């Protein structure tokens, strides 16, 4: 099983869509989490079908930016627990021996709001004692050379 997570900074760009499609074909992920989709639900459904995924959930963009989505294959018994503009939290194989948890996460881009992101992660962590895979863009900079553009 492979999981692919990408902050695409606008999936509506044809080059970005092509690059993500190439990654999907090359790695055959069972789950794909995408942050900053900048797309509405109808377009995400079209991409789900194009990339041959069986399921999808999204929190569509608000205003000009944002948006998170998860696509998954049917072999992943994907049960969404909670979602928001910044996360999608799900239990995989719910009630089975190999039950585990996946969270796709997009941290608050505004540094003054990072505390909200960390509070959300702490709340999510406390909900279950399952094995947990949390992937995404936390919008945290550890070293100055990591920062490109933005604020």
Predicted features and spans:
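A shared catalytic/ligand-binding motif for oxyanion handling
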Residues: 1-151
């Amino acid at each position: 099983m492979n999981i692919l997570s990408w902050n695409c900074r606008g999936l509506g760009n044809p080059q970005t869509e092509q690059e993500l499609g190439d990654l999907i074909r090359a790695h055959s992920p069972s789950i794909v989490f995408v942050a900053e989709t900048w797309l509405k639900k109808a377009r995400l459904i079209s991409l789900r079908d194009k990339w041959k995924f069986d399921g999808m959930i999204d929190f569509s963009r608000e205003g000009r930016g944002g948006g998170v989505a998860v696509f998954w294959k049917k072999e992943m018994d994907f049960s969404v627990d909670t979602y928001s503009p910044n996360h999608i939290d799900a239990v995989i194989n719910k009630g089975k021996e190999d039950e585990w948890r996946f969270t796709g996460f997009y941290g608050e881009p505004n540094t003054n709001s990072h505390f909200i992101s960390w509070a959300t992660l702490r709340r999510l962590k406390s909900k279950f004692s399952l094995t947990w895979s949390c992937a995404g863009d936390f919008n945290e900079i550890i070293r100055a050379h990591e920062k490109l553009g933005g604020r």
